[in-house]
Regions:
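Active-site cofactor/substrate anionic-group-binding motifs, chiefly glycine-
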Residues: 8-61
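General beta-strand structural signal in soluble alpha/beta enzymes
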Residues: 42-44, 65, 70-76, 97-101, ...
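Phosphate/diphosphate-binding glycine-rich loops and adjacent basic-rich segments that engage nucleotide
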Residues: 106-176
Length: 189
C-alpha cells in the first residue's frame, strides 16, 4: 500500500503467526508511562507495532508543536513497518521527523558467523525546497522482508547479501532464512 513490497501485505502471515503465538496482543492499549513537556515513554503492552508507532509519532508531533521538540520512546512493541512512514508524518506537519527501531538479530558482524545485530531501520524526513528531504534505510545490506521476497519467488540472492551458517557467502534464500530463524549461524551482511 505504501509502495514497499517487502513491508506490505506480505507481513500479514508473519503478524498472524505472532498473534497466534501470543507475541502480539491485539487488544493491547498503548499507555504513556512517563511524560515531560518534551518527551514521553509509551508502553505498547506487546500490541501491533504500527498502531503504537503512529501513537508515538502523533504525540511527538504534538509536543514539538507546543515545546519546539518532541521525543517519544516506545517499549514492549512489535514490528512497526516502515520507519520512513513515521518520519514523513512529522514532515507533513512542517517538522523534522526522525524514526528508528531495533530488530531481531539477523546481521552477521564483520568476520563473524552468527547473526548478532539487528537491521535496526532509521529514517529522517524534513521540509525542504523544491522537494522534502527523505532518508529511510536499514543498517544491513538488505532487509529480511526482501530475503523473504526472493525466497517466495524462488530466486537466488544477489552475491554479497548473505552468509550461510559457516560464515561463507550464500545466494540460497531458503537456507539463509532457516538459519536466521533457527539461530544456527549465518544471516545478512
Amino acid at each position: 500500500l505504501y509502495g514497499i513490497e517487502s513491508h506490505g501485505m506480505q507481513r500479514m502471515v508473519r503478524y498472524h503467526k505472532c498473534i497466534e503465538k501470543g507475541m502480539i496482543h491485539v487488544d493491547a492499549k498503548p499507555e504513556v508511562v512517563f511524560e515531560t513537556p518534551v518527551s514521553a515513554v509509551i508502553d505498547g503492552h506487546d500490541g501491533m507495532g504500527q498502531l503504537i508507532g503512529h501513537k508515538a509519532m502523533t504525540l511527538a508531533i504534538e509536543k514539538a508543536k507546543q515545546s519546539g521538540v518532541g521525543i517519544v520512546s516506545v517499549r514492549n512493541s512489535n514490528h512497526y513497518g516502515i520507519a520512513g512512514y513515521y518520519a514523513k508524518m512529522a514532515c507533513r506537519e512542517g517538522l523534522i521527523g526522525f524514526s528508528c527501531t531495533n530488530s531481531e538479530a539477523i546481521m552477521v558482524p564483520t568476520n563473524g558467523r552468527l547473526a548478532m545485530l539487528g537491521s535496526n531501520p532509521i529514517a529522517c524526513a524534513m521540509p525542504a525546497e523544491p522537494y522534502d528531504f527523505f532518508f529511510d534505510a536499514s543498517t544491513t545490506v538488505v532487509t529480511r522482508g526482501k530475503l523473504e521476497m526472493y525466497n517466495k519467488a524462488e530466486k537466488p540472492l544477489p552475491e554479497g547479501w548473505a552468509l550461510d551458517k559457516d560464515g561463507h557467502p550464500s545466494t540460497n534464500a531458503p537456507d539463509v532464512l532457516a538459519n536466521i530463524v533457527a539461530k544456527n549461524g549465518g544471516g545478512i551482511m
